[in-house]
Amino acid sequence: MNIYTSPTRTPNIAPKSGQRPSLPMLATDERSTDKESPNEDREFVPCSSLDVRRIYPKGPLLVLPEKIYLYSEPTVKELLPFDVVINVAEEANDLRMQVPAVEYHHYRWEHDSQIALDLPSLTSIIHAATTKREKILIHCQCGLSRSATLIIAYIMKYHNLSLRHSYDLLKSRADKINPSIGLIFQLMEWEVALNAKTNVQANSYRKVP
């Protein structure tokens, strides 16, 4: 399944037939080939039942070329190479005091949290860091659901891709991601909000004499 077969989030900038959106690509060994769509979610598995260190055996995983990494709960040593760290797990330790040189954000999400109000500010934090070419780590406890949801939301907004595209893109680079169904529903609402904002902006532009 080609991850670019669905339309982009806004039809006015969709690629021509057969042409992929111009996203930078990662090296082959940094990507997975498994492409499962949000509508084909596996049963959600609680992090407590998994061997977390086997999910990312090589440490933080580069998932987007703008220096965005996905990971499970890190050690202090693993945080040191990063400029910005976003921890979106209620149960994960807040390590900001141990890494004073790192811009550290802790949003205490649970798997059933209402995250919609946090997505605009969090995706803006990520985007601001990318414009400064800073190295960004986004993590939760396992690195499968909450942190993946945030990265998908970022892709949707700043790469202007649909939820399906954004999910498949991240899935192709971190094949074990598995956002809970509740978070997927909230990403669907995020997509509606982004489309509504785009339509308002497009209409305003057309009214300019």
Curated annotation (Swiss-Prot):
- What organism is the protein native to? Saccharomyces cerevisiae (strain ATCC 204508 / S288c)
Question: Which parts of the sequence belong to the Tyrosine-protein phosphatase domain?
Answer: 59-196
Question: Which residues of this UniProt protein bind 4-O-phospho-L-tyrosine?
Answer: 111
The UniProt record lists the keyword Disulfide bond: yes
Where along the chain is composition biased (Basic and acidic residues)? 28-43
Under which main EC class is this enzyme filed? hydrolase
Regions of biased composition (Polar residues) lie at: 1-11
Keyword Hydrolase, does the record have it? yes
Q: What does this protein do?
A: Mediates dephosphorylation of MAPK substrates such as SLT2, acquiring enhanced catalytic activity under oxidative conditions.
SMART domains from the UniProt entry: DSPc
InterPro entries noted in UniProt: Dual-sp_phosphatase_cat-dom, Prot-tyrosine_phosphatase-like, Tyr_Pase_AS, Tyr_Pase_dom, TYR_PHOSPHATASE_DUAL_dom
Q: Which PROSITE patterns match?
A: TYR_PHOSPHATASE_1, TYR_PHOSPHATASE_2, TYR_PHOSPHATASE_DUAL
Q: Name one Pfam family in it.
A: DSPc
Any single GO CC term annotated in Swiss-Prot or TrEMBL for this entry: nucleus
What does the record give as EC number? 3.1.3.48
Q: Which residue pairs form cystines in this protein?
A: 47-142
Q: Which UniProt keywords apply?
A: Disulfide bond, Hydrolase, Protein phosphatase
Active-site residues per Swiss-Prot or TrEMBL entry: 140
From the UniProt record, give one GO term of the biological process aspect: signal transduction
Family label: Belongs to the protein-tyrosine phosphatase family. Non-receptor class dual specificity subfamily.
Q: Which reaction does it catalyse?
A: O-phospho-L-tyrosyl-[protein] + H2O = L-tyrosyl-[protein] + phosphate
Q: Where is this region: Disordered?
A: 1-43
- What is a GO molecular function of this protein? protein tyrosine/threonine phosphatase activity
Protein name listed in UniProt: Dual-specificity protein phosphatase SDP1
